[in-house]
Amino acid sequence: MVPMTTQTSHQIRSTTVLPAHREDVELHTADGLTLVGELALPVGPDGAPRTPSATLVTFHPLPTHGGFMDSHVYRKAAWRLPALADLAVLRFNTRGTSSPRGTSEGEFDGGEAERYDVAAAIELAEFRELPRPWLVGWSFGTELILKHGADPSIEGAILLSPPLHRATDEDLDRWAALGKPLVVLVPELDDYLRPEEARRRFARVPQAEVIGVDGAKHLWVGESAVRRVLDEIVGHVLPDHPLPLPTHWEGSLDPA
């Protein structure tokens, strides 16, 4: 008689790392800098990387206030979404930003020279033939997307907690002309821009979908807030994918 094998069920917590192929990558900017990052890809039954259904190209919060490629929402996206939603997740440090992965060359430029960083990230996705790239920005990262990310090669963009401090009406008009989907997640209790004002500001982008998130704050602290963000991302990038995402994983885990 062949013994039955059972897989261990793991509750997905803040430190849970689900299986994926993770590799260090370098991005090269048109002004001569090397930026450091990581690409997480879904894996097949044999553990080898496979082509994802879509790609998230992420842009982190303000580096002068602690933002970097490991900011918690993006770290959890990279730890979970390749396995749960068949998504590739590209994270990187913008110029002058450090993380355990390393330090990107250059200096913080307030969102101006970072235009080259945005272009380098989009180009890496193209070079690696990563399918259906969506830009995902958080706080300062939303400013980079609005100012520099309106590229015809992308599928759309998702903005988390956009402050709209640096992005102008002209930037929004550029997105309106591009016509690509623009999904805007705005915390009810945001420190900078709340849902009602966000709807007014983004009204000049006809395709923008502004979603107010009850009880949430700018930093999306807490597992319930993170789950809401990841569900919204997957729901827009892969509309046919079952939601909510699972809270348990059957099988092995990767080391943290």
Q: Each predicted region: which residue ranges?
A:
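An N-terminal hydrophobic leader/cap segment in hydrolases
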Residues: 1-29, 33-49, 140, 243-256
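Serine-hydrolase catalytic machinery in alpha/beta-hydrolase-like enzymes
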Residues: 26-28, 33-128
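Gly/Ala-rich beta-loop-alpha elbow adjacent to hydrolase catalytic centers
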Residues: 136-145
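Acidic catalytic loop of the alpha/beta-hydrolase fold
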Residues: 165-166, 188-193, 218-219
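Short alpha-helix in the alpha/beta-hydrolase fold that links the catalytic acid
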Residues: 170-172, 193-203, 225
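Short beta-strand/loop motif that positions the catalytic acidic residue
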Residues: 178-179, 184-186, 190
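Catalytic histidine neighborhood in serine/cysteine hydrolases
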Residues: 203-219
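Catalytic histidine-centered segment of alpha/beta-hydrolase-like enzymes
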Residues: 216-228
